[in-house]
């Protein structure tokens, strides 16, 4: 009797299970269409494993943008701080970015070697960084340019480059900082010749043609009494963004024994926050001070 009863109860359950499986298979089949072959034309842009993924953004036609929006020459601190604010937003909103470096109208974002964010698709890295950065630039514009309306939306192009070792990554960042120094020294002399000596842009270019670093430093010092080494670090070295653990002390009410109820105590908590630095990336000193950036990635 028990065997017969069990068979009759189990039978409807088994039938229901079979029917459900058939419906699921039918649903999958119906979800496909004759047009689905177009997916075969999509390019596999998966980044190679065990490589640092670097996304570099550059402002599109920013010479014109800076001119139209009355940027100060040779450097506008408002524009540089706005760029850094946008970069901070990118690092806070997106995943696996361990360090960023920016100067002028460009920023580079370094994703962890082991990142599997969006299955390491280069198009996702590039488009998400570019869109987050560009939208942040518009969103925070008024915080830095209170008296200058945004006349038209800015644009940023992006590229993805893979670096297979810690040394190649360090060399990349050193290259970008060396570029910052070369460009800023030239621009500092160029605009001094225009603004203080009254030269035209063409005349200033001719004056600087063929000059070396020592020559430019000499022009600045002898003609304009400017010691380039005393120029702000942000202009000369660019900005580095890193995550740092900091101790935060706050006074707050906490649960205490009855005899101490109502009292406040200072509570220290460790948290990770973004820190902006204007320091040397060239050489080993920075990497010795921040070993956590490269640790555990090989």
Curated annotation (Swiss-Prot):
Binding site for Mg(2+) 1: 58-59, 105
Record keyword ATP-binding present: no
Entry keyword set: Cytoplasm, GTP-binding, Magnesium, Metal-binding, Mitochondrion, Nucleotide-binding, Nucleotidyltransferase, Transferase, tRNA processing
Enzyme class, broadest EC rank: transferase
Subcellular location: Cytoplasm; Mitochondrion
Pfam families xrefs: Thg1, Thg1C
EC number: 2.7.7.79
Record's keyword annotation contains Plastid: no
Example of a GO cellular component annotation carried by this entry: mitochondrion
InterPro entries found in the cross-reference section: Thg1_C_dom, tRNAHis_GuaTrfase_cat, tRNAHis_GuaTrfase_Thg1, tRNAHis_GuaTrfase_Thg1_sf
Cofactors demanded by this protein: Mg(2+)
GO biological process terms on file: mitochondrial fusion; protein homotetramerization; response to oxidative stress; stress-induced mitochondrial fusion; tRNA modification; tRNA processing
GO function term, MF aspect, one: identical protein binding
Binding site for GTP: 58-63, 104-105
Reaction(s) this enzyme catalyzes, per UniProt: a 5'-end ribonucleotide-tRNA(His) + GTP + ATP + H2O = a 5'-end phospho-guanosine-ribonucleotide-tRNA(His) + AMP + 2 diphosphate + H(+)
Residues the record lists as binding Mg(2+) 2: 58, 105
Assembly with partners or alone: Homotetramer. Interacts with MFN1 and MFN2; functions as a guanyl-nucleotide exchange factor/GEF for MFN2 and also probably MFN1.
Family, similarity comment: Belongs to the tRNA(His) guanylyltransferase family.
Name of this chain's protein: Probable tRNA(His) guanylyltransferase
């Amino acid at each position: 009797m028990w065997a017969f009863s069990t068979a009759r109860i189990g039978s409807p359950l088994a039938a229901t299970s079979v029917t459900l499986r058939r419906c699921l298979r039918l649903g999958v089949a119906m979800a496909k269409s004759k047009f689905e072959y177009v997916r075969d034309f999509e390019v596999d842009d998966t980044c190679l494993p065990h490589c640092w993924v670097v996304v570099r953004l550059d402002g599109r036609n920013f010479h014109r943008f800076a001119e139209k929006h009355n940027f100060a020459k040779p450097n506008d601190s408002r524009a540089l701080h706005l760029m850094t604010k946008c970069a901070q937003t990118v690092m806070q909103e997106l995943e696996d970015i361990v360090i960023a470096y920016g100067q002028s109208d460009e920023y580079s974002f370094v994703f962890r070697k082991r990142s599997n964010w969006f299955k390491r698709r280069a198009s996702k890295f590039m488009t998400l960084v570019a869109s987050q950065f560009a939208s942040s630039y518009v969103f925070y514009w008024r915080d830095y340019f209170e008296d200058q309306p945004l006349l038209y939306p800015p644009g940023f192009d992006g590229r993805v480059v893979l670096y297979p070792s810690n040394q190649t990554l360090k060399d990349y960042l050193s290259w970008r900082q060396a570029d910052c120094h070369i460009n800023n020294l030239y621009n500092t002399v160029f605009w001094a010749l225009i603004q203080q000596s009254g030269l035209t842009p063409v005349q200033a270019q001719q004056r600087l043609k063929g000059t070396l670093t020592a020559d430019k430093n000499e022009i600045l010092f002898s003609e304009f009494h400017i010691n380039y080494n005393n120029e702000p670090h942000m202009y000369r070295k660019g900005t580095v963004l890193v995550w740092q653990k900091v101790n935060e002390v706050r006074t707050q009410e906490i649960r205490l024994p009855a005899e101490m109820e109502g009292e406040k105590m200072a509570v220290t908590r460790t948290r990770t926050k973004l820190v902006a630095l204007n320091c040397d990336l060239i050489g080993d000193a920075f990497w010795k001070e921040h070993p956590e950036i490269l640790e555990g990635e090989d």
